[in-house]
């Protein structure tokens, strides 16, 4: 039961952060009105053509890290690295298609690649650490989802609008 609850909680966080940002805000991390976009990027690693290494590194590492908990949690249920990677790919594909279909953000092939990699890393790490840590991953996912919910509830009350600098 706890395994399914933790997976559902973390998946809800993932859905909220990838497809629902036009409908809420956490402080001044993003402007909800700027999140309604439909952009399709099919060229892998095109972020590197921008001239900066920081943007691509942040993007790719962030996508990978974002799916590692998902990989940990799915592996704790199915005990298969291959199935976990497939689930990571499937969820990422659904999120990317929803972003495009409903104009909720950028649909990027790199997201699909690095999200799947994150799920794979999470599964490999869960396998390496063994079952004794499965409850830890589950409770951490639930705690992270609870913190996220508090941040969403506090929303625009967080942060100082005078300290925001538009780049």
Regions found by a protein language model. Give the residues of each.
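Bulky hydrophobic segments
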Residues: 1-103, 124-167
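Alpha-helical transmembrane segments that form the membrane-embedded catalytic/substrate-binding core
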Residues: 103-129
């Amino acid at each position: 039961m706890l395994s399914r609850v933790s997976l559902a909680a973390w998946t809800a966080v993932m859905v909220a952060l990838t497809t629902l940002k036009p409908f809420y805000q956490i402080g001044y991390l993003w402007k909800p009105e700027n999140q309604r976009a439909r952009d399709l990027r099919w060229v892998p690693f095109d972020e590197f053509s921008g001239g900066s290494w920081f943007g691509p590194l942040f993007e790719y590492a962030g996508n990978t890290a974002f799916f590692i908990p998902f990989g940990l949690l799915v592996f704790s249920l199915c005990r298969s690295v291959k199935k976990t990677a497939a689930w990571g790919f499937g969820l990422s594909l659904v999120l990317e298609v929803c972003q495009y279909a409903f104009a909720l953000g950028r649909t990027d092939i790199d997201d699909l690649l690095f999200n799947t990699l994150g799920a794979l890393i999470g599964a490999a790490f869960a396998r390496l650490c063994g079952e004794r840590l499965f409850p830890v991953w589950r409770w951490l996912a639930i705690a992270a989802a609870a913190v996220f919910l508090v941040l969403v509830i506090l929303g625009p009350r967080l942060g100082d609008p005078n300290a925001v600098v538009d780049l």
